[in-house]
Amino acid sequence: MKAFITYLYLVLLFAQSLSGFAQTDTSIQLSLNQAIDLGLAQRFDIKNQELAIQISESNREKIQSKNLPQVNASVDFRYNAILATNLLPPGFIAGSKEYTPVKFGTPYNTLTTITATQNIFNANVSGDKLVSQAQKEYDQVSLEKYKIDAKSAITQAYYQVLLNQEQIKLSEENVANAETIVKKGESEFANGTLIKTDLSRYQLDLSNAKNQLQTASRNYENSMLSLKTQLIVPFGSTIILTDGLENLINGTDQEANSSSNPEQRYEYRMESSMMRLNEIQAKKYNRSYLPSIYLYGNASIQNQNSKFTPFNTNTWYPYAYVGVHADIPIFDGFEKSRNITGYKLRTLQNKNNLEKLSYDIQTETVNTRNQLSTAYSQYQTSKENYLLAQSIMTVDQDRFNQGTLTAAALKNTEYSLQNAQNNYLTSIYNVLVAQVNYKKAKGEL
């Protein structure tokens, strides 16, 4: 119930945001956690899997109903236009030497019946109940799989948008710096202190900086489109991300270890659920050799007359009976035995898959831990280089403004700063993605 209320709240909040956007051109502001919650509430694959769980529950309840009394009523009205003829053997009627044709019954016959059955023991029904419960558990683990995959995709799409936002800011700064150098170069060229080739080189640098800005803008648009696709929101909506790369990386836990518990991974639990399902199927077929027993009863009242007189109580004749019915399997051509063998072999396959998954999960955990450690180490180095490049750029910018540093030397410093900036941003993104992959490998996402 709590999950339903949360889901309803998110949907209403999102619908209100989109309504406001359509009317007043407002934007949707999302933190990473809000984006994940919104995406989980919107995604069609998750909705379908939730419906699959409801279908499994409905099937389980349907099977349980087979153990409840089954009561039916019927009414049959019959008009015998020509009564059936029966032959009595010779001698049945005194003096008869040949078969004597006779007709029994009345032209009008109305039968009202109530029948009831109640299972006493039915191995198939109890087996189906266990199978339906195991299927529901498998569907629940599958829902967890969809949610974890969605969290991973949304998180990485969110990170990519943030990275491209920062790339745009850096590209804009590079364009501004290049424009400053071009303006000063044009002044020097006019004064005759700068040759045409050097000015053309500055102008080329400005053109390249503008191209990089356009590329960064296109990358941002593509990444935003990818995020909207993950969140299932209208492509025309405007999304503003409230988290930043620096804030997100400061909130990550870098204490990585290689310990792993395969049972925390949905892949392992899905295989375990499938193995349990196959084991239950084998038991179900094994128990189908047992007899099925049920009680039954019938209460009827019949109207017979030469005329149609349904309201004449003197022409109604009741009867009733009860009994016990048993179906005993004797020979089915070895069908049950072969089904049991098939499910036992599938169970062995499941066990092999679980062993392989356990090994693969441990390997993946170690690999993602190493990738996270490497990414974080590169991040620390890139951060130091970026801070150093910033300080050098500050000094050289002052020297350039004072006329003690050439534009070419300043350009070299700017290139170094650009590389340091790009490496720094990329290292942040790599740490965040590595953190997601590591948590997913450990089953903690």
Residue ranges of model-derived segments:
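Periplasmic alpha-helical coiled-coil/stalk elements that build and connect Gram-negative outer-membrane
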Residues: 3, 30, 58, 149-262, ...
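Sec-dependent signal peptide cleavage junction
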Residues: 18-41, 45-53, 221, 236
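Bacterial Sec-dependent N-terminal signal peptides
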Residues: 1-32, 43, 67, 425, ...
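Short segments within alpha-helical structural elements
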Residues: 211-233, 387-444
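A small-residue-enriched
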Residues: 40-120, 262-333, 363
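Heptad-repeat register of long alpha-helical coiled-coils used for dimerization/oligomerization
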Residues: 29, 33-36, 43, 119, ...
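Sec/SRP-type N-terminal targeting helices
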Residues: 47-51, 64, 109, 120-147, ...
